[in-house]
Amino acid sequence: MKVDYLKKIEQCIAYIENNLTHKVYIDDVLESTYYSYPHFHRIFMDFVGEPITSYIRKRKLSCAAEELINTKKTIIDIALDYNFSSQQTFNRAFTGYFGISPLKYRNNGMLDDIYKPFNFKDCFFEELLSIPVSIERLQPMKVASYHSFNGNIKLKNSRQEQEKEISKAWGNLIRWQMSYEYQKQYGATKKLPATRELGKFMIDQNHHLPPYTRYFGFINPFPMNCNEFGYETWAMLTDISEHIKTEVQYKDIVIKDYDGGLYATSEATYGPDSNLDKVWKSLHYWLMQNQQYNYGEHQWLEEHITKSGEGGFHSFKLYLPIQPTR
């Protein structure tokens, strides 16, 4: 039986909007969805453009800002009304998001940077893309993994700070992989060259291309508060040398077994003008219109695509986990 996820997200948003002056717990928001937080969080984020935790905090602060301008309530009363533990806590959160204190915001006398409630009619369907979708099964694989996490993400510049964590995760994983592949070929006792030479070695040997390796990334964990963000990166390993694997050490690299799974896939562009978010949204909509499949519970993935003779990533392939509709 197909689940109407759009309706469930609307129900979640309605619950949040009706409880902004209360402590909003994730479990209460999800009560009507009957899905785990990791599963539903990704669907919510791709539709709405914000994690549930960030959406709640931005809406609370925006409603508080409106009351600063439109009412004569004291700042402490507004802080307590929106469930902040003290005026000091409210001041820090408000200043972190709006860039000025609640008092200065009130004195300016104008609403600015207000985060409005999400509206599907205005914000969802106009961004859908006509995309080709393929059904693919990823086979089990062994991967090297690096996980980057920041528990102090600033709400105002959250996207930029998240991008820093993603870059950090990829940088550390790729540095380990280059060292691993070099010493696998030349021996663990051979001195490692500079990073630029390691990169040239990888490209010359085509060690950065399928089927030799593939690169996947995903958000991990799903944040339990608006200041958390984590990203995990994978590099597929082939022809694994257990000896070299133990010799080439790098902090926080973990070797994992991935079980594989069934996916709906589509491609997205890379770079500053990437259509990644729109393609994810369009993949969701494709699945909602498809009666043969429903969401699967296995890992969501973004494959980062490489090119022959060039370093870096050049496009995405998105993997939406699916299962046959029961």
Report each predicted region and the residues it spans.
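Basic/polar phosphate-binding segments, predominantly the helix-turn-helix DNA-binding elements
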Residues: 23-56, 79-101
